[in-house]
Amino acid sequence: MPSFDTVSEANMVEVKNAVDQAGKEITTRFDFKGSDARVEQKERDLTVYADSEFQLNQVLDVLTNKLVKRNVDVRFLDRGKIEKIGGDKVKQVVKIKNGIETEAAKKIVRILKDSKMKVQASIQGDAVRVTGAKRDDLQDAMALLRKEVADLPLEFNNFRD
């Protein structure tokens, strides 16, 4: 019976490359000269430092542009609140989401069940496995999920025949 897994994972190598590129651009840009603006990465957390809230937004804009150019979906980013760290300096922690949360997984299963397609969906940890009798049914299910689930960057992998 053919099946595939629906997952939501960011390519961490591309994220690291985008952070490095953003850091290089920030150090060479004229409007950041003499400022403490930078982006640091620790595993799945990006910490953005800047001298003011306006500058923080500019650094985040540079970072998101680099992520988009490296084909990393910006819907993976979960921005925290802006914290003051002394004087006018501010920082913001941006978490990179990994996996499909339980609520979103239940929503995906519900969408597939409500569509009356001949597929079964089951939650497997942070992924959703979709199984069907025919490969065509699975392709229709993938098209439906791409159309219906707009708030999550979905990927399909682990195809079995």
From Swiss-Prot:
It comes from the Bacteria. It comes from Herminiimonas arsenicoxydans. One of its GO terms (molecular function) is nucleotide binding. InterPro entries: DUF520, UPF0234_N, YajQ-like_sf. GO terms for cellular component: cytosol. Keywords: Nucleotide-binding. Pfam families: DUF520. Belongs to the YajQ family. Nucleotide-binding protein. This is Nucleotide-binding protein HEAR0865.
